[in-house]
């Protein structure tokens, strides 16, 4: 009985230490992905994380952002397409899907930037008020946007959508200039 009690206390101390480190690290720069251009505000309220497609778009987004409250995270390539319907497949399938997704460096980078954790997900540790997916207006951008939304729709990350933290930005497809006047067009029909 004493060994059980000591083991329970050790688990509790370890959990508190993990939570303390996580809370401490939530708004500190250490441990954040190198590609992340973080914002200057150290609180979540009013901050925005722009997830952009590729390093070149990341460079443009970094130049055009308001550093005070906007962060930019460029992701390269397409993430793994894994979705599990928890109602039909059960918890075991969700766990397998999550571990499969965690094999992607881009997903690990995204989760680290969000600050919520994965298996020990806690929405209270979310570093940004708004998560804005901003991909190119072409077919590849649409596919990457769909894959990111699919990932965010999986448990436990679906809480980000349910709590109104996920947004989509629609960039223009073309810029048309005539006589020193420019307009942006979002599709080929315009």
Where are these regions (language model features)?
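Acidic beta-strand-to-loop metal/phosphate-binding motif
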Residues: 51-53, 128-138
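Alpha-helical scaffold elements adjacent to nucleotide-binding pockets in ATP/GTP-utilizing enzyme cores
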Residues: 106-109, 143-151
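A short alpha->loop->secondary-structure connector
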Residues: 67-69, 151-157
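Conserved nucleotide-binding/hydrolysis micro-motifs of P-loop NTPases
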Residues: 56-58, 77-80, 138-140, 166-168, ...
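Intrinsically disordered, low-complexity regulatory segments
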Residues: 32, 61-131, 161, 178, ...
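Charged C-terminal transducer/switch regions of large nucleotide-driven machines
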Residues: 24, 33, 165-190
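GHKL-family ATPase ATP-binding module
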Residues: 1-78, 84-90, 121-123
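N-terminal assembly/transducer modules of large multi-domain enzymes
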Residues: 1-10, 134-143, 155
């Amino acid at each position: 009985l004493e060994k059980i009690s000591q083991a329970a206390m050790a688990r509790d101390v370890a959990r508190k230490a993990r939570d303390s480190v996580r809370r401490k690290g939530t708004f500190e720069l250490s441990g954040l992905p190198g590609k992340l251009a973080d914002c200057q505000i150290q609180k979540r309220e009013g901050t925005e994380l722009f997830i952009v497609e590729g390093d070149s778009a990341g460079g443009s987004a970094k130049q055009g952002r308001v550093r005070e409250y906007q962060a930019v995270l460029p992701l390269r390539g397409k993430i793994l397409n894994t979705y599990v319907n928890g109602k039909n497949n059960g918890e075991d399938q969700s766990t397998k899907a999550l571990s499969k997704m965690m094999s992607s460096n881009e997903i690990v980078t995204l989760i680290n930037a969000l600050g919520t954790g994965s298996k020990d997900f806690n929405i209270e540790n979310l570093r940004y008020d708004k998560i804005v997916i901003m991909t190119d207006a072409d077919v590849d951008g649409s596919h990457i946007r769909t894959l990111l939304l699919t990932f965010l729709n999986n448990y436990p990350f679906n809480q980000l959508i349910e709590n109104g933290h996920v947004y989509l930005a629609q960039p223009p497809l073309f810029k048309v200039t005539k006589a020193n006047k420019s307009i942006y067009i979002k599709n080929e029909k315009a």
